[in-house]
Swiss-Prot record:
The gene is mtnD. InterPro entries: ARD, ARD_bac, RmlC-like_jellyroll, RmlC_Cupin_sf. Its cofactor is Fe(2+); Ni(2+). This is Acireductone dioxygenase. Disulfide bonds: none annotated. The lineage of its organism: Bacteria, Pseudomonadati, Pseudomonadota, Gammaproteobacteria, Lysobacterales.
Length: 185
């Protein structure tokens, strides 16, 4: 189940809010310009599935979003717990960074933790299968897939180059707990 925890950015041990209610998650994130929606992942795909398999399963949804929002590039992050490069892949996203475009992800399997740093608050969003999240450009954040990553997310970009992170150089991400999934997705 999706989960949102909100913290003061100096108090990682004490959440100000901890909820699994989808309506509350969406409302709290909307306050900071983040879109959170529950969709239906209609085609079964397993973590580790190829980009081609995921594209084939979700072609209609991908085409619709590209047409509606003007995305120029789409790819798939699909990582299974037995991936030999999982530790390296995890490290790539663990430090605070931002993008010069919205970060839009649709989770079609598994789960991962987006952590946003907005003002003096930290928002941890556990995204699971059926979650769509759109983080506005310029929002500082990090992503943790856990020690044994198990997820498939379709990633949408307005820039043709795809994922380009601009790292802030702060250590805030190290001050917050690492991701341990609350459910098997």
């Amino acid at each position: 189940m999706s989960r949102l925890r909100i913290y003061d950015d100096t108090r990682p041990e004490s959440p100000l809010l901890d909820t699994q209610d989808g309506a509350i998650i969406a409302a709290e994130l909307q306050k900071i310009g983040v879109t959170f929606e529950r969709w239906q992942a209609t085609a079964p795909v397993a973590p580790g599935a190829s980009q081609e398999e995921v594209f084939a399963a979700y072609r209609a949804d991908i085409d619709r979003l590209v047409a509606e929002r003007g995305f120029k590039s789409v790819d798939v992050a699909s990582i299974a717990p037995d991936n030999p490069n999982r530790a390296e892949l995890r490290r790539k996203f663990l430090d605070e960074h931002f993008h010069k475009e919205d970060e839009v992800r649709f989770f079609v399997a598994g789960s991962g933790l987006f952590t946003l740093h907005v003002g003096d608050k930290v928002y941890e969003i556990e995204c699971v299968k059926d979650d769509l999240i759109a983080v506005p450009d310029g929002t500082t954040h990090w992503f943790d897939m856990g020690d044994e990553p198990s997820f498939v997310a379709i990633r949408f970009f307005t820039e043709p180059d795809g994922w380009v992170g601009h790292f802030t150089g702060t250590d805030i991400a190290q001050k917050f707990p690492r991701y341990v999934p609350t459910q098997a997705s």
